[in-house]
Structures are given as structure tokens and as C-alpha cells.
């Protein structure tokens, strides 16, 4: 009896028809493709994109050169050099992030005691050469200055979860 059933399943191509029914169901279903450059999907408030360095309201940079972000970075993408000022405080003389190494884990942002380094919502950046993805301190400060309002709003919205 089993051999007769297997013969009819094979002869009538039951498995093929079942597969085509599944394909047909998805063929006529509503499409969910997003046409990327024109349409954009919403971004989570906790999205980790391009890095930025922040300043205080008086214009002074926030980074105190504690080097916690450099120490906690698992990809070793951050390199910092610091120097003493005349008033005895320590500030960065060089702060570089190599985005070809960075894995955007957010550890640097979590480790920073003064919220100097943050990750923005910017994900549309590119480089023609490898060196274009090597961000220096002036570049990071410029990004922070440009997007400070958005960064502050995201920090305030996320404050109760930190």
C-alpha cells in the first residue's frame, strides 16, 4: 500500500505543487522593499553610528584625556595623546579613531566619565581611500558641533536607561 501511495505522490508531483503553492503565496503578497536613498526607515534612538566629540556650553572640549575609551576599545581603534596645561589640567593633544577598525560597540561612549565621545545617528559616510576613514580630533569636534542639538536630545531621552 505504501509503495502505491509513493508512486502517486511521485507521478502526480505532489511535492512540486506544494512548493509552487508556497512560492505563489509570497509572489502575490505585499512587497516590503524600501527604496533606500529616497525612503529611509526610522532609526532607533540608541543607534550607534559615526563618532563625535562634544564641547561644554562655554566652548571648551569635554575630553579630559583619561584614556578610558582607548583602554576599553576591543578593536584598538582609538589612539590618544595628552599633555598638561598651564593650569594643571590634562587635555588631549591628539585623539584619533580609525573607523576601519571600529566595531561600533559603544564601549567608548559608556566608559567616558564626561560624555565627551558619543556615537551619532550618522550612518551615511564613506571614504574614497582608506585614510578618509581615519578621523582626527578636529574632525570629531566639527561633527559634535554640527549635531550637538540632536546629540543632547538623544542623551536626554536615554538618560533614564543609563
From Swiss-Prot:
Segments forming domain 4Fe-4S ferredoxin-type: 53-83, 93-122
One of the GO biological process terms: aerobic respiration
Cofactor binding mode and count: Binds 2 [4Fe-4S] clusters per subunit.
Family annotation (Pfam families): Fer4_7 (PF12838)
Gene Ontology MF terms: 4 iron, 4 sulfur cluster binding; iron ion binding; NADH:ubiquinone reductase (non-electrogenic) activity; quinone binding
Compartments where found: Cell inner membrane
EC number: 7.1.1.-
The protein's name: NADH-quinone oxidoreductase subunit I
Record organism: Chromobacterium violaceum (strain ATCC 12472 / DSM 30191 / JCM 1249 / CCUG 213 / NBRC 12614 / NCIMB 9131 / NCTC 9757 / MK)
Organismal lineage: Bacteria, Pseudomonadati, Pseudomonadota, Betaproteobacteria, Neisseriales
